[in-house]
Amino acid sequence: VVVVVYDENGKIATGIPVKMYNEKDYKVFEKDNLTLPTAVARTNESGIATFILPQEEWFAAQSQRFFTFVVQEGGGPDNYQIWSSGRTVEAGKVVKIEIRLTQFPN
């Protein structure tokens, strides 16, 4: 899975941590934004965070999984901002997701 992160001006955002949550962990994250992610990757100089999901680990029981990718500033009960995109990922397929860090409220 390739996640491209852009800032509010549409420019690539480098060095940004992108969190990935599986179905179960995202339900917990929705109630507590300090929940540890299933996986995390940082955007490179091209604004791309790459998640490699080996079939035997992620798709052993099913050929498709729903993952949510999150960029978060701050955390806890207040003073935080979250941008996310959820997507069904099929084993063996490359998926490209874009997250735009728009300013609140948007």
Q: What is the predicted function of each stretch?
A:
Residues 9-34:
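Short, ordered, surface-exposed loop/turn motifs in non-cytosolic proteins
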Residues 1-7:
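A short, amphipathic beta-strand motif
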Residues 42-46, 62, 90:
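Surface-exposed coil/turn segments at beta-strand junctions on protein surfaces, enriched
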Residues 80-106:
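Extracellular beta-sheet/turn segments enriched in Thr/Pro/Gly and aliphatic residues
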Residues 17, 22-24, 53-57, 73-75, ...:
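A mature extracytoplasmic/lumenal domain signature
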Residues 28-54:
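Short, acidic Ser/Thr/Gly-rich low-complexity loop/linker segments typical of extracellular
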Residues 57-77:
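A short, solvent-exposed beta-strand micro-motif common in secreted/extracellular proteins
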